[in-house]
């Protein structure tokens, strides 16, 4: 009887501690509510009435900066008028299952929808598979208030610059639609050496000729806003989360405004 009781107590203890055990750091194991988050949040966003001015927040490179990310969420939840938050890649540091889960546990506390694009660190280990399961397609888009928002994988180095990333034919197809203006989100900017140099000209040409309002990136870990190709297209790079900084982009029919905020 004592042996049976001890066995039951041990099973209860192990069940309560299941989150502490992993069979492998490279495992892929997500709960159903942790899957396909970008599409779920697109559906949430579409249910929110469009205001005269669309205001969205961009952050980058959350990686291992969990405390700073918690503070960011608390800061955003105190504000009004924000439509959504975009995490611009390097969600994780090592592409591990637990890292994806930890970041989502923090960001799901936001009172507005959030979206994430894939970064180069997210393609380490089984990270690419985990990203696909947790967030969905690496290239995705949605329309809100007549504006088009496009998420694009630009992590060319992770596939050996084999010509597959970024997928410019897909991007061209997305830019063929009818919209007021498009905003492109990706992790690696075209002026980084980790962007396929054979695709820089075609990428920048697509933006210049297809009513793109801004190309928005992370990866560099420092904030910048510039016109590097002197073609009228602005390039925004957001700082890494440890810099305790984010960008607020406000858009209406007359202008687009960008501000860096600190918390």
Predicted regions mapped to residue ranges:
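Binuclear metal-dependent phosphoesterase catalytic core
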Residues: 20-37, 59, 142, 224-263
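Acidic-and-aromatic substrate-binding clefts and catalytic sites of carbohydrate-active enzymes
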Residues: 62-67, 91-98, 123-128, 159-162, ...
